[in-house]
Amino acid sequence: MHSSSKSQAFSLTFLLFLFLLPSVSESQLISSESRTLLEIQKHLQYPPTLRSWSNWTNFCYLPSSPSFKILCFNGHVTELTVTGNRTVKLPGRFSSDSLFTVLTKLSNLKTLSLVSLGISGPLPSQIIRLSSSLQSLNLSSNFISGNIPKEISSLKNLRSLVLANNLFNGSVPDLRGLSNLQELNLGGNKLGPEVVPSLASNLITISLKNNSFGSKIPEQIKKLNKLQSLDLSSNKFTGSIPRFLLSLPSLQNLSLAQNLLSGSLPNSSLCNSKLRILDVSRNLLTGKLPSCFSSKKQTVLLFTFNCLSINGSPSAKYQRPVTFCENEAKQAVAAVKSDTKDKERKEEDTGIELGLVIGIIIGVILVSAVLAGLVLVRMRKSRSKEEPLEANNVDQVTVCSNTTRSTTSKTVPDLRRVPQTMRSAVIGLSPYRVFSLEELEEATNNFDAENLCGEQLYKGCLREGIAVTVRCIKLKQKNSTQNLAQQMEVLSKLRHMHLVSVLGHCIGTYQDHHPYAGSTIFIVQEYISNGSLRDYLTDWRKKEVLKWPQRMSIAIGVARGIQFLHTGVAPGIFGNNLEIENVLLDETLTVKLSGYSIPLPSKVGAESPSNEDGEKEDVYQFGVILIQIITGKVIAAASSELGSLKLQLENSLRDEPSVLRSLADPCVRGTYAYESLRTTVEFAINCLCEDQRKRPSIEDVVWNLQYTIQVQQGWTSSENLGLGGSEL
């Protein structure tokens, strides 16, 4: 009997082993795919998330996180998700061709997500060789350029295609072949002006925001009966808003903000009853609001900065004169027609030129030998003349001393030796340059007190008509102008999307009895006139514009500005003056940090803090800004109100969701995912930790905000409503 029991126990154990064996083998990756993953690690140049991989790594058992995930089935990789935090391209030896060639070896992939990893270059045509099972492809926040290859439409099983925030340009290929596609996100590129030729009929979410699409809103959209979210904001669409757009049966979220749309909003009783958010702000619309929205309290309608007739409404102050919109609309239409004619003319000219070229080639061949001889002789002569000129080339630099101007000569440096950041312009900015003191005196009306807009900060206007601010920093006498000039290279690098960028500088010397007697550096920066975050949080009219997605966009803009100051220049800039007064917003609500530390160790005043202390102090100040963004309350960093509010938020995380919701700014009610709000609050509290060693790094700050934005986007695109922001 005892022997029988042992036998039964052994049999059960053996059967259990056989039962578990398949599941173990399913998670054991075949050796060829293990080698492929190590190749991918190498091509991505060992990002932090993948740095621990080795030949002995059991990839299928690696723990998942929001930034990393590998799933296996039957010995094959079915999902590869890697999210980095690179803000610059991978070094020159990187090859997108090589990377995607390696990726094709993962033949069973269903999900491929490579985000913020510095991938650059064109998207190669071998993308067609990716797994035929691929359902989700996310290559967002990289530096991929060129056209989107037409081969991408051969990935028949794709349900989600996200290529947002890259450098794609030109037209979008025909996507009708992607019959299973439900999500298409091409936002934040340079696509256009032609719109997408044909779209997949089963699309649920489309984002084409922040591109250069022009002409009218395409008629083909009216066939997308399953469409729930459509974001065409920040493009150049013209014409009127088509009536069918408000009648799409499933549409919940529609953003047409920041285009050139004109005419009146469709006044139709057929307005979609499911529509929750309609954002038509910053267009050229006239007339009245649609009557079909008057009885729909559940619909949020954003319409600021148009020319609408809304007398009696608080938003009337945010409407422009009708004549402004009418004139701008005419110019927009004329520009589109001009572009179309130019394109047609170029096509005609191409045909004519082709015939001419064939005839001319024969003549060119006959005379080319003679010309070549003449050119060689001419080049020798010009070279002998140019070489001494290059050595003696001088520029006149004006240096003012009290009321007397003296002119001294300074050799212009060889442009090949000038730092790249000083030679090349950042998008939207003029190239960095050295100003004369005379130019700045003229721009500021001799530093008139009427132009003073802050401590030692003047607003002015350059001769070219560019509005600027001039920041005056008095320097220690012991530092010579020559030594200071060597420090200017760092200044030239302070040019970033989320900074009030430096346009140039001037080092001048005034005599005694002048406010800036001695050596002074004058730093010329952008002028941002749309107000600060403080203005938006204290003016209830402006505050209404800042819904949750816009606030998250502002938060990550601040974080990326700080990240650039810490890691985008060498040495990093720490201990910055981070307050909501210094978070400026341009007309598109893009963040521009001002008042940050200028890296001049020789300036009068305290030295910069150490890197670690300065970073943690910046993170703390960011936490204070984040608390104000969440609650809508303006508070001081060292106030008791901050401590009390922090404690309330901490306690609310352990309570019912309604408690935390009650602490959020009422202006964002109904526009956020609760999980996005909760995660943001948790992270803000971590930034305010008394023990600075426990505060997150700025890289953690950016990563966590990206995660909260992803949570918000998922909530928006799945079953709820949302708002389009410049970073979302």
From Swiss-Prot:
SUPFAM superfamilies named in the record: L domain-like, Protein kinase-like (PK-like)
Membrane topology: Single-pass type I membrane protein
Signal sequence, start to end: 1-27
UniProt KW keywords: ATP-binding, Glycoprotein, Kinase, Leucine-rich repeat, Membrane, Nucleotide-binding, Receptor, Repeat, Serine/threonine-protein kinase, Signal, Transferase, Transmembrane, Transmembrane helix
Entry-listed glycosylation sites: N55, N85, N138, N169, N210, N253, N267
Ranges that cross the membrane: 357-377
Molecular function via GO: ATP binding; protein serine kinase activity; protein serine/threonine kinase activity
Annotated Protein kinase domain residues: 421-709
Entry GO terms, CC: membrane
Enzyme class: transferase
Subcellular location: Membrane
Alphabetical list of Pfam families matching this protein: LRR_1, PK_Tyr_Ser-Thr
Highest rank taxon of the organism: Eukaryota
Keyword Nucleotidyltransferase included in the entry's annotation: no
Record carries keyword Glycosyltransferase: no
InterPro entries cross-referenced by the UniProt entry: Kinase-like_dom_sf, Leu-rich_rpt, LRR_dom_sf, LRR_Rcpt-Like_S/T_Kinase, Prot_kinase_dom, Ser-Thr/Tyr_kinase_cat_dom
Ranges for the LRR repeats: 74-96, 106-130, 131-155, 157-178, 179-202, 204-224, 225-248, 249-272, 274-295
Residue ranges annotated as Extracellular topological domain: 28-356
Catalytically driven reaction(s): L-seryl-[protein] + ATP = O-phospho-L-seryl-[protein] + ADP + H(+); L-threonyl-[protein] + ATP = O-phospho-L-threonyl-[protein] + ADP + H(+)
EC assignment: 2.7.11.1
Stretches of the chain found on the membrane's Cytoplasmic side: 378-728
Family membership: Belongs to the protein kinase superfamily. Ser/Thr protein kinase family.
Name the record gives this protein: Probable LRR receptor-like serine/threonine-protein kinase At1g14390
UniProt source species: Arabidopsis thaliana
